[in-house]
Amino acid sequence: MTNLRQLVQFAKTEPARIFFISLLAITLSTADQSLFSYAIPGLLEEFEIDLNIIGYMLSASFFVASFAVVFVGMLSDYIGRRLVLVTLLGLSALFVGLHAFADTLLVLTILRVSGFALGAGLYLVASTMVVETAPQKYRGLVAGTLQIGYPFGFAIASLIVVPLIDTYGWRSIFLPAFIVLLISPLIAYVLPESSTFKNLQQTSGDENAKGLSDSLRELLSDHKPHLFICFAGSFLISLAIGGTTYFL
């Protein structure tokens, strides 16, 4: 009962608001990004390509995203989590929505790569905000619960796709992404900045003056085993999800 009361009290706090809004952002972004997988049969037919070309497009998306998330992480340390998260949500939704109007395979590839890279960065920032503001006792719980947004986003996308794609074709399924673009200013209004980031901004010189090379050196020297274990786990999970989502 004590733990239950503590959870109820937590639900009324600013960290809880950050958690629920971040969960919404991840769900919406995942729904947007997953639309591409449903469009693949239509793409193969309209552009008269085989699955190898789709594989190259997806590989390019993941490759660019792997570098984009590093840049996004650095950017969020300098200008704030809130601004970066909302900007990524809006821009990724815009690029996904524009899939509906792509008239060439090159344009479609550029939109896919750009939208996916921005969406990948959003997951990073949302997770960071939630973990660094959650009470230490419940960080594992809220971090795990946040992952609900990924399968839930896919579920929402499937409900949207089924009635649209049969009637209006593959292009129509990307149009709901513009709704997410319209929602992003509202999310910006209600989402508070991470208190941890605000506290870091108030600290003096030495910490804030660290460059990228200094930060990476410190990370590799102090947290190398954890870093590589987490990287390997993330890599293998992404390998499995990517293969089963897009090619089975």
Question: What residue ranges belong to the model's regions?
Answer:
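Helix-breaking motifs and short loop linkers at transmembrane-helix boundaries and internal kinks
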Residues: 48, 80, 101-107, 118, ...
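Helix-loop-helix hairpin linking two adjacent transmembrane segments in secondary transporters
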Residues: 146-189
